[in-house]
């Protein structure tokens, strides 16, 4: 497969993930939304997705490497979708999370296990709905973005599989 065909998948994926990251930082710095623990986790997964796409663009691997990069991109998008789905679920049932909200500075002084638990399972501030657009909350938009980003490598992997079978 030519370099142009490889870039036709990874370049739009990189641009889309970068656009979503820029939008999330815009909502924080300009609009004034304060991100919760799950929002930070979703940003991390989005950054991993963008870095995988950037590495694939720079590296220009052979067939096995393209599949590996597409698999890594799919895994990071799937992980982000799981986190966003958890966030949507928490907002749908606010009784699930209890406790009090701690500033990030205090959270980082806690043991690593508690930090990971908070960033993966959510914290009490994750249940508040502070912004919506077209009747979708920010975690719902995030879930939609991750599902669309996951469709890119998934469609490439499925098409690769069918091309490989057709050639055999």
UniProtKB/Swiss-Prot annotation:
Residues 1-9, 62-67, 160-168 are cytoplasmic. Residues 27-44, 86-140 are periplasmic. It is found in: Cell inner membrane. It comes from the Bacteria. GO terms for biological process: protein folding. The chain crosses the membrane at residues 10-26, 45-61, 68-85, 141-159. Required for disulfide bond formation in some periplasmic proteins. Acts by oxidizing the DsbA protein. Belongs to the DsbB family. This is Disulfide bond formation protein B 2. It comes from Pseudomonas entomophila (strain L48). The lineage of its organism: Bacteria, Pseudomonadati, Pseudomonadota, Gammaproteobacteria, Pseudomonadales. The gene is dsbB2.
């Amino acid at each position: 497969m030519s370099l142009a065909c490889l870039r036709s998948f990874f370049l739009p994926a990189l641009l889309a993930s970068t656009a979503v990251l820029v939008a999330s930082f815009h909502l924080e710095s300009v609009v004034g939304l304060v991100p919760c623990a799950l929002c930070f986790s979703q940003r991390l997964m989005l950054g991993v997705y963008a870095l995988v796409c950037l590495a694939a663009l720079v590296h220009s691997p052979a067939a096995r490497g393209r599949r590996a990069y597409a698999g890594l991109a799919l895994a990071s998008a799937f992980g982000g979708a799981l986190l966003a789905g958890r966030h949507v679920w928490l907002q749908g049932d606010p009784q699930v999370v209890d406790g009090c909200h701690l500033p990030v500075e205090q959270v980082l002084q806690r043991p690593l296990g508690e930090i990971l638990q908070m960033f993966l399972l959510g914290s009490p501030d994750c249940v508040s709905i502070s912004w919506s657009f077209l009747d979708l909350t920010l975690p719902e938009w995030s879930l939609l973005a991750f599902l669309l980003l996951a469709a890119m490598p998934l469609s490439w992997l499925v098409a690769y599989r069918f091309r490989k079978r057709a050639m055999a």
